[in-house]
Amino acid sequence: LKCNKLVPLFYKTCPAGKNLCYKMYMVATPKVPVKRGCIDVCPKSSLVLKYVCCNTDRCN
């Protein structure tokens, strides 16, 4: 997950209200993202799922 301050055209900007980028993946397979996108609050990781969040509203 790249946290971007400057936005090239192909990076997406999160909508208002969901200004954190995040990536979710299984703890067993950290190289394979399950889901990525924008969220309002960074979820807590569990034993099965791990979340990585950016504090910027621009992500790839």
From Swiss-Prot:
Sorted alphabetically, the Gene Ontology cellular component annotations on this record are: extracellular region; membrane; other organism cell membrane
InterPro entries in the record, alphabetically?
Cytotoxin_Cobra (IPR003572), Snake_3FTx (IPR003571), Snake_toxin-like_sf (IPR045860), Snake_toxin_con_site (IPR018354), Toxin_cobra-type (IPR054131)
MF term (GO), any = toxin activity
Keyword tags: Cardiotoxin, Cytolysis, Disulfide bond, Membrane, Secreted, Target cell membrane, Target membrane, Toxin
Q: An example of a Gene Ontology BP annotation on this entry?
A: killing of cells of another organism
Pfam families xref list: Toxin_cobra-type
Q: What tissues contain this protein?
A: Expressed by the venom gland.
S-S pairs: C3-C21, C14-C38, C42-C53, C54-C59
Q: Where in the cell is it found?
A: Secreted; Target cell membrane
CDD domains in the record, alphabetically? Answer: TFP_snake_toxin
Task: Give the protein family.
Answer: Belongs to the three-finger toxin family. Short-chain subfamily. Type IA cytotoxin sub-subfamily.
Task of the protein: Shows cytolytic activity on many different cells by forming pore in lipid membranes. In vivo, increases heart rate or kills the animal by cardiac arrest. In addition, it binds to heparin with high affinity, interacts with Kv channel-interacting protein 1 (KCNIP1) in a calcium-independent manner, and binds to integrin alpha-V/beta-3 (ITGAV/ITGB3) with moderate affinity.
Q: How does it assemble?
A: Monomer in solution; Homodimer and oligomer in the presence of negatively charged lipids forming a pore with a size ranging between 20 and 30 Angstroms.
- Can you name this protein? Cytotoxin 2
